[in-house]
Amino acid sequence: MTENLHSRKMVQPKKFRGVRQRHWGSWVSEIRHPLLKRRVWLGTFETAEEAARAYDEAAVLMSGRNAKTNFPIQRSSTGEPTPAAGRDARSNFSSGSSTTNLSQILSAKLRKCCKAPSPSLTCLRLDPEKSHIGVWQKRAGARADSNWVMTVELNKDAASTDAASQSTSATTAPPATPMDEEERIALQMIEELLSSSSPASPSNGDDQGRFII
């Protein structure tokens, strides 16, 4: 009878995202990095709620306003997401952690897990509505956003693609500012795609550039 009551107590607690219970009763929290596709260990906690709040903190640090959390996200005066941590949160890597200390600890664990973190996810993309092709980037972090790094307009005359790429490279970065490694790679990706899609000799027909992503 006692064993049945004990097993029921183990099943009753609400299930939280990124939280699981050990056989001896403690709760552990871990989160999967959205870009690196690997799990980050967040620690062991006394209650499921504390573990869930630690998960929420890590989710906001990695995904910002797009984070999927267990509890509602509070907004600061600047509009940034700030999930509140439990008052009595204690883990195996810090005892009596405050909200600020918990955020610092989680940030340190994420940096340690990702020794060479990838700040963004970059890929070639075609935008048929605006008739251009370019490099699209999604950043990770507390201020996660997505934007076009650079674009090349799809002209009807395939012979003008070289001029379009040159004008685009001239407008993407100021002349006085050296091109960083990320922009250089992005521009190289576009130039290679344009050169592989251009015909051997220009013609005045109705052919238009076709790009396959």
From Swiss-Prot:
Ranges of Low complexity compositional bias?
Answer: 159-174
- Output the GO biological process annotations, alphabetical, semicolon-separated: abscisic acid-activated signaling pathway; cuticle development; ethylene-activated signaling pathway; positive regulation of DNA-templated transcription; positive regulation of response to water deprivation; positive regulation of wax biosynthetic process; response to abscisic acid; response to osmotic stress
For whether the record's keyword set contains Transcription, the answer is yes
- Start-end of Polar residues biased regions: 70-80
GO MF annotations, alphabetized:
DNA-binding transcription factor activity; sequence-specific DNA binding
Q: Which subcellular locations apply to this protein?
A: Nucleus
Q: Where is this region: Disordered?
A: 70-99, 159-213
GO terms under cellular component: nucleus
UniProt cross-references to PROSITE patterns, sorted A to Z? AP2_ERF
What is the annotated tissue distribution of the protein whose record heads this document? Mostly expressed in roots, stems and anthers, and, to a lower extent, in leaves, seeds and silks.
Please name the Pfam families in this protein's record. Answer: AP2
Q: DNA-binding region at which residues?
A: 15-72
The family database entries (InterPro entries) matched by this protein are listed as:
AP2/ERF_dom (IPR001471), AP2/ERF_dom_sf (IPR036955), AP2/ERF_ERF_subfamily (IPR050913), DNA-bd_dom_sf (IPR016177)
The entry assigns this protein to a family as follows: Belongs to the AP2/ERF transcription factor family. ERF subfamily.
What this protein is reported to do is described as: Promotes cuticle formation by inducing the expression of enzymes involved in wax biosynthesis, particularly promoting very-long-chain waxes formation. Confers drought resistance. Acts as a transcriptional activator binding directly to promoter regions of CER2, CER3.2 and KCS1, wax biosynthesis-related genes. Binds to the GCC-box pathogenesis-related promoter element. May be involved in the regulation of gene expression by stress factors and by components of stress signal transduction pathways.
This protein is called what?
Ethylene-responsive transcription factor WIN1
- Per the record, the gene is EREB46
